[in-house]
Structure formats: C-alpha cells, structure tokens
C-alpha cells in the first residue's frame, strides 16, 4: 500500500507520500509520485490504494474542483457522493488526502469526507506509524510542517514493509 501524511502548522499545509508500489509481495516500483498539485496549484492531494484507481479519482476530483470553482469541501462532498453511488466508482479502492489554504480532508470510497480535528492526516498501510510520529513532533517540538511530514514518512518507511523512504512532498503557504 503506501503512506500519505499531511500536517498543517504556522501558515503552511504539507502533504507527503512515499514512493513504493507493490504487487502482492513484490516491490514493483520505488519512486512513484503519489502526491500532486491540483486546481491551478491551489490544492494538494495524495492517495493511498490502487494507483490506477487513484489517478481516476484525482481526475474526477479535479473536475469537481473546476465545477465548484475551487471550493474544496463542496468538491470533496460531491466526489464522495458520486463515489458511493456510481457502480463503477464503487469498485475503486483508494483513499484521498486533500488540502487547501482552509481545510484538510480525507475522502473515502464509503462516501465519507472527514476533516480531522487537529489537521493531521495519515492514511495507508504506514498511516498509523506516521500519525504517531507526527503527533509526537507536533506536541513536543517547534518543527515546521514540512520537517514533521519528512520525519514522519521516514519513520513509517523504517517500520512498514509497504512503505519506503522515497518522498514526494507538496506544500502550500497561506
């Protein structure tokens, strides 16, 4: 699977992801880019789950952003509705972590859109490890959002067999 982590702190929101792609018990690729910018670079997003499924969802989410003039929450809710009700989309297996200058959200295939209380998102197989590391760093250091994401991904990469230490990181400043 993968690890995606997002942290919001001091006017910065960052999403980072590892690069490992596995097929069964074989590592197929180590430098996949699972985080990208959307909607005129105003939204950042990362995915955990099937790569082809995630690219389909990125495309659909970007269309929703265009339709709703970049309103992140509205676009996320509309994507989640479609994902839950459309027969073809229901078969897609992925999670999205998305953020803009105002909100950080998790979008699931069950039709859930979750905004975490503490603006910390960690999804994928290494998510619990990255979340624990990020929470400890948020509560006990003055590190910036990018440093916390980098360190959390590194820790998850050391622990989770489906996560590696290759990192793709995107950041928005607001």
Curated annotation (Swiss-Prot):
Residue numbers annotated as active site: 2
Recorded superkingdom: Bacteria
GO biological process, one term: proteolysis involved in protein catabolic process
Annotated catalysed reactions: ATP-dependent cleavage of peptide bonds with broad specificity
GO CC, one annotated term: cytoplasm
Family: Belongs to the peptidase T1B family. HslV subfamily.
Keywords associated with the record: Allosteric enzyme, Cytoplasm, Hydrolase, Metal-binding, Protease, Sodium, Threonine protease
Protein name: ATP-dependent protease subunit HslV
Pfam family, one: Proteasome
Subunit record text: A double ring-shaped homohexamer of HslV is capped on each side by a ring-shaped HslU homohexamer. The assembly of the HslU/HslV complex is dependent on binding of ATP.
Binding site for Na(+): 157, 160, 163
Keyword Cell division part of the UniProt annotation: no
InterPro entries with a match to the protein in the record: ATP-dep_Prtase_HsIV_su, Ntn_hydrolases_N, Proteasome_sua/b, Proteasome_suB-type
NCBIfam families: ATP_dep_HslV (TIGR03692), PRK05456.1 (NF003964)
Glycosyltransferase listed as a keyword: no
Role, per record: Protease subunit of a proteasome-like degradation complex believed to be a general protein degrading machinery.
Entry EC no(s): 3.4.25.2
Signal peptide span: none
Molecular function terms, GO-annotated: metal ion binding; threonine-type endopeptidase activity
Means of activity regulation: Allosterically activated by HslU binding.
UniProt-annotated location(s): Cytoplasm
